[in-house]
A protein has these predicted regions:
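Intrinsically disordered, low-complexity terminal regions
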Residues: 1-325
Length: 325
């Protein structure tokens, strides 16, 4: 009988502890109910220059003016939606005290137009869609990571910077003097560009794909990164591909390429008047040239060229090859 009582008391204690832990875990979790409700709040001002979106929220900036913000969210989540303006930063997120897990959230925040933005940042699967055209201002920097997404209609600024990482995505149209874009860790940047100078980096399976026109492009791809710019017409181009990185270009005046360690560069749409190609360690360059070509291939590197160019300088060694196709 005593043993039976001990076992019963032990089981009761285990059940009580399990229930206690379950209750505590439920408090630390927030799961959207699917029942969407709405409310409208008013911003302190609408002249912030930095916007940060986090925790899976969907933010839409529309053409409306004023300071009113509409929030559509699950009825058990809407009270935890934060739209907080501190100094020059507007933060939009979901924040429940002591909560460590958020799932199945349905949160849409609609903002009025604000052309004062100089910095946009999205994290943790948040998304931002900017509908208005921004036709004034000097700079705009966009940073996205952790599966977040930014889509812009049209941005016109002197300088535009984009940094995407960890499966994040950026899409849009940009008119600027200078564009710098970097994609890493399976992130993707896809944009239409009209710029004087474009600088691109792609690494760790990141991808940058651009179309449009530029005076000068500088591109670097490494560690299986991809720069796809065959639909971006460029007067001058400099490209370097290493460690299985891939670059496609379209340069019609001057082209300078270097490919090593199985890097791959292709520029065959337009014929560059002057071209330089250097390959080594299994690197590959394929180009179109109508004027003079300086080519150097070593250690199993391959250069293939077409067009009416003449070889001003040609060097091969250690299994490197230079061939016309």
């Amino acid at each position: 009988m005593k043993n039976f009582l001990k076992i019963a008391l032990t089981l009761a204690a285990v059940v009580a502890c399990t229930a206690s832990f379950a209750a505590r875990d439920n408090k630390r979790q927030l799961r959207g109910s699917g029942n969407i409700v709405s409310k409208v709040i008013e911003l302190t001002s609408n002249d912030y220059s930095n916007l940060l979106a986090m925790t899976g929220v969907e933010v839409i900036m529309d053409e409306s003016g004023g300071k009113m913000v509409k929030i559509d969210a699950d009825d058990n989540v809407i009270d935890y939606v934060i739209c907080e303006e501190v100094n020059d930063l507007l933060t939009i997120t979901v924040r429940k005290p002591d909560c460590t897990s958020y799932s199945n959230l349905n949160v849409k925040v609609t903002l009025p137009k604000n052309e004062n933005l100089t910095r946009i940042e999205c994290r943790s699967a948040a998304s931002l869609y900017v509908k208005p055209t921004f036709a004034s201002g000097d700079k705009l920097f966009i940073r996205v990571n952790s599966s977040a997404r930014v889509m812009v209609n049209r941005i016109e600024r002197e300088d535009v910077g984009i940094d995407a990482s960890s499966s994040a995505k950026v899409q849009g149209s940009f008119k600027c003097s200078r564009l710098a874009a970097k994609a890493s860790s399976s992130a993707n940047i896809n944009a239409s560009v009209l710029a004087k100078k474009v600088s691109i980096w792609a690494t760790s399976s990141g991808e940058v794909e651009l179309n449009g026109a530029t005076t000068q492009i500088t591109a670097e791809a490494t560690s299986s990164g991809r720069v796809l710019c065959s639909r971006l017409s460029a007067q001058n181009g400099v490209a370097m591909a290493t460690s299985s990185g891939k670059i496609t270009l379209d340069c019609y005046d001057f082209l300078n390429t270097k490919a090593t360690s199985s890097g791959d560069i292709i520029s065959t749409n337009s014929a560059a008047k002057t071209a330089i190609a250097e390959v080594s360690s299994g690197g590959s360059v394929k180009l179109n040239c109508s004027g003079s070509l300086n080519a150097k291939a070593t250690s199993g590197g391959d250069i293939h060229y077409t067009g009416g160019c003449s070889l001003a300088n040609s060097q091969t060694s250690s299994g490197g090859s230079i061939k016309k196709f």
